[in-house]
Regions:
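Core segments of cupin and vicinal oxygen chelate
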Residues: 2, 11-56, 61
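Vicinal oxygen chelate
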Residues: 2-3, 7-15, 46, 51, 68-133, ...
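A short, local hydrophobic-aromatic micro-motif
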Residues: 5-8, 33, 78, 105
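Alpha-helical elements of the RecA-like P-loop NTPase motor core of helicases
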Residues: 21-22, 91, 126
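A short, acidic/glycine-rich surface segment
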Residues: 34, 43, 64-69, 104
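Short Gly/Pro-enriched turn/cap motifs at secondary-structure boundaries
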Residues: 37-38, 71-72, 106-107
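Acetyl-CoA-dependent GNAT
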Residues: 60-66, 130-132
Length: 133
């Protein structure tokens, strides 16, 4: 069987490209690495890169958009979870989210894995978690 070496990137459809790119860039300390558009498909897109984790996140804004909003109950994406090292890292992230004014859950130690949940500007469910060992 051919080998998969990892997830190359995660791409989200967003209502406002500039708003989402600014929000995720500030949240993750990432940098904008690519922008482009394709008139044939009616899209504008951007990719950001977070060097510590080597994570690439991409965003697409469609000229024609569905406006019903995100729901984890609709088949498709449930949430995106960012991995952190340990409980102390979750506490640091809670402080970072607070400093950015991003509403979030308390640390949920009763979950497996322990986590903090919040949403992006489009209501996409996000999580910070670490595996209990």
């Amino acid at each position: 069987m051919p080998e998969i070496t990892g997830i190359a990137h995660v791409e989200l459809s967003v209502r406002d490209l500039d708003t989402s790119v600014a929000w995720y860039t500030e949240l993750l300390g990432a940098r904008d690495v690519w922008r482009g558009s394709n008139g044939k498909y009616g899209i504008t897109a951007c990719a950001i890169y977070e060097p510590k984790s080597k994570m690439v996140f991409a965003f697409t804004q469609h000229a024609e958009q569905e406006t019903s909003g995100f729901s984890p109950r609709r088949p498709g994406l449930d949430h995106v979870s960012f991995g952190v090292a340990d409980h102390a890292a979750l506490e640091e992230w809670v402080n970072h989210l607070d400093a950015l004014g991003i509403p979030h859950s308390p640390i949920q130690d009763d979950h497996q894995p322990p986590s903090v949940t919040f949403s992006d500007p489009d209501g996409i469910a996000l999580e910070l978690s670490y595996p209990k060992r």
